[in-house]
Amino acid sequence: MDTTDELLALEHEGWRSLCEGTGDTFYGELMTEDGAMVLADGSVFDRDAVIASLDQAPTWDTYELTGVRRIDTGPDSAALVYTGRAHRGDEPPFEARMASTYRYTGGRWRLALYQQTPLP
């Protein structure tokens, strides 16, 4: 499995965890200790805040990732950039450009930074 496939598999695992209500556990294990998420509303969460917010977060029904591309950011890091679309009940779909930056450390890929930019 190449790097793009490995990172995309992690992205899908993360989205599935958000659909299943286990995002707090998944991202608690995936994120680096100093990791952060920058959300569509402008909030910036450190790892502990991500875990706490996902503990009670409503689940998504479905999701899709399109336009995925990998950007190498260093010898032990890479980012995936894509468009994500998620659906929940009768709400309008959430759609944003997303970037996940990973660092290879301790023998595995860890999420260092995740960022969302909502689409109009």
Sequence positions of predicted segments:
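A beta-strand edge to alpha-helix "cap/lid" segment located at domain peripheries
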Residues: 1-29, 34-120
